[in-house]
Swiss-Prot record:
Swiss-Prot/TrEMBL keywords: Cytoplasm, Exocytosis
GO biological process, one term: proteolysis
Family: Belongs to the peptidase C69 family. Secernin subfamily.
Function: Regulates exocytosis in mast cells. Increases both the extent of secretion and the sensitivity of mast cells to stimulation with calcium.
Protein name (Swiss-Prot/TrEMBL): Secernin-1
Further details from the record: 'Secern' is an archaic English term meaning 'secrete'.
Location of this chain's protein in the cell: Cytoplasm
Gene name in the database record: Scrn1
Length: 414
């Protein structure tokens, strides 16, 4: 088992967020060569007693799944981060804990992100669904597309809706959760929940005592009890990035935080890279739509955040989706990952050209980046107009919003 790469998920709620908005963001730090895709799945009614095939195992399907949009490593079923039609956003962090994560194939933390989005109408309902599935099926299996080594982790989640956020941290089937109703919060690759636990597994403390990790005499501190002895519990650079913001936090603020390499929030190392990013704005006024911005490409400092709004007729974006290999996918065969197919989608390939220009040609790179940021700015301003309008947007005008943004970006790269 290797250490989890530095990865950060954020939320800002009023009064720290601007104009009665909840702002959510995440950088997904993954192996450098891994491709993430952005995929929309409509709401679906399912047959009774049907199954859903997750990354490694199949579980019982529910009668109806909600419409979702997710950013995910292209080889797996679940999601690193995403949102659903009810304004629920979930992000996952891989964490190391005192108890090693199981290598036995079960549900991945990323599967639980997607399952929570497909089945939950609020952040709390999604949390309840995740811990129920965790208890029934467990978590385990390889987090990376790697035939030579199994990289298994415990999982933490940030679950957000228009009203509140929840931090959920899990160790095996055991878990603890904290409700956040105001201010800012960041989670990273370390257990962060301390003594304020709003909900927990009914046997959490008994289990800790049985392992000799807690005597029962002193106050129960979840992170101290379940973290490895050498873990630094105070090293979440992302929390500092949020707390030092003097102005109200906006979508642009969150984007700037995600692009910050100096703080370590945007990772670009020999082994790992921020392979995709998301920012969502959830208005507490329910007459305004939630807006979700995805990059679909690596390194947010060299990517464009493109908006998505849920409507009944969303136009699919195949240019941001990886090739499908069906049952021949090496991730679905056992032994797994014996081959590594080319999972790059069209947007990813176009973005590779842009990255090469930025890295190799200083003048052309500056010009290219300036134009990219201008394109992004136009999108942000158009979305601000939608949020400030007393009327909901015309579904016909926003159903192809993400499609048009991807198309414009690719034409520009060409």
């Amino acid at each position: 088992m290797s250490g989890a790469p530095p990865s950060y998920s954020f939320v800002a709620l009023p009064p720290r967020a601007k104009d009665g908005l909840v702002v959510f963001g995440k950088n997904s730090a993954r192996p450098r060569d891994e491709v993430q895709e952005v995929v929309y799945f409509p709401a679906v009614d399912h047959d009774a007693e049907s199954k859903v095939e997750c990354t490694y195992i199949s579980i019982d399907q529910v009668p109806r799944t909600h419409a979702i949009v997710i950013s995910r490593p292209a080889w797996l079923w679940g999601a690193e981060m995403g949102a659903n039609e009810h304004g629920v956003c979930i992000a996952n962090e891989a964490i190391n804990a005192r108890e090693p994560a199981a290598e036995t194939e079960a549900l991945l933390g990323m599967d639980l992100v997607r399952l929570g989005l497909e089945r939950g109408t609020t952040a709390k309902e999604a949390l309840d669904i995740i811990v129920s599935l965790l208890d029934e099926h467990g978590q385990g299996g390889n987090y990376y597309e790697d035939a030579h080594s199994c990289h298994s982790f415990q999982s933490a989640y940030l679950l957000v809706d228009r009203d509140e956020a929840w931090v959920l941290e899990t160790v095996g089937k055991y878990w603890a959760a904290e409700r956040i109703t105001e201010g800012v919060r960041c989670i990273c690759n370390h257990l962060s929940l301390a003594t304020k636990l709003d909900e927990e597994h009914p046997e959490l403390r008994t289990y800790a005592q049985s392992q000799g990790w807690w005597t029962g005499d002193d106050e129960f501190n979840f992170a101290q009890v379940f973290s490895p002895a050498d873990d630094r519990l105070d090293c979440c650079a992302g929390q500092d990035s949020l707390e030092k913001q003097e102005e109200s936090i906006t979508v642009q603020t969150m984007i700037n935080i995600l692009r910050d390499k100096a703080s370590g929030v945007c990772i670009d190392s020999e082994s790992f890279l921020t392979t995709a990013s998301i920012v969502s704005v959830l208005p507490q006024n329910r007459s305004s739509p939630c807006i979700h911005y995805f990059t679909g490409t690596p390194d947010p400092s060299r990517s464009i955040f493109k908006p998505f709004i849920f409507v009944d007729d969303v136009k699919l974006v195949p240019k941001a989706q990886s090739p499908c290999f069906g049952d021949d996918d090496p991730a679905k065969k056992e032994p797994r990952f014996q081959e590594k197919p080319d999972r790059r989608h069209e947007l990813y390939k176009a973005h590779e050209w842009a990255r090469a220009v930025i890295e190799s040609d200083e003048e052309q790179g500056r010009t290219l980046r300036k134009t990219m940021l201008e394109l992004e700015k136009q999108g942000l301003e158009a979305m601000d107009e939608i949020l400030s309008s007393p009327e909901p947007p015309d579904p016909a005008e926003v159903g192809d919003l993400f499609y048009d943004c991807v198309d414009t970006e690719m034409k520009f790269f060409k």
